[in-house]
């Protein structure tokens, strides 16, 4: 007599109120016939995949075979850790930008004439930087990677003999 021809009985191990299909119940009967033992006390299973993707099963039904292999049943949810990290970094970046903007507006309201003179001097210094001997593409790259002004990028490139990597490292470290 095959499993399919047997009347399907509700298995007591299924959570009450779950909407399982007949095939899942039959699969659980077959699992029990294979001699697998149910493992109690597991509330969450996480499986790591390449590229920081996690497969998460909450409230799983877990069986253990005689050769220490585990069979996990339950609803799988996919979590992309890389996307979550990018979203977290963006939110942190926005938070720091708003804090910086608030600090700038606070400072600009209380700015004294001496402060404005210093700001004007720094703008004049940035305009007066000599870019001879430095490639424009290298300057743009250093500006983008180190998030600095053009004058600082040119200065760093000149100090590091037009070595882009060392210029970026000197500006960011």
Curated annotation (Swiss-Prot):
Keywords: Cytoplasm, Nucleus, Phosphoprotein, Protein transport, Transport. It is found in: Cytoplasm; Nucleus. One of its GO terms (biological process) is protein targeting to membrane. The keyword Transport applies. Gene3D superfamilies: DNA helicase RuvA subunit, C-terminal domain, Nascent polypeptide-associated complex domain. PROSITE patterns: NAC_AB (PS51151). GO terms for cellular component: cytoplasm; cytosol; nascent polypeptide-associated complex; nucleus. One of its GO terms (molecular function) is unfolded protein binding. Residues 21-85 form the NAC-A/B domain. Residues 134-171 form the UBA domain. The modification Phosphoserine is found at residue 122. Residues 89-117 are annotated as: Disordered. Belongs to the NAC-alpha family. Component of the nascent polypeptide-associated complex (NAC), a dynamic component of the ribosomal exit tunnel, protecting the emerging polypeptides from interaction with other cytoplasmic proteins to ensure appropriate nascent protein targeting. The NAC complex also promotes mitochondrial protein import by enhancing productive ribosome interactions with the outer mitochondrial membrane and blocks the inappropriate interaction of ribosomes translating non-secretory nascent polypeptides with translocation sites in the membrane of the endoplasmic reticulum. Part of the nascent polypeptide-associated complex (NAC), consisting of ucp15 and btf3. NAC associates with ribosomes via btf3. This is Nascent polypeptide-associated complex subunit alpha. It comes from Schizosaccharomyces pombe (strain 972 / ATCC 24843) (Fission yeast).
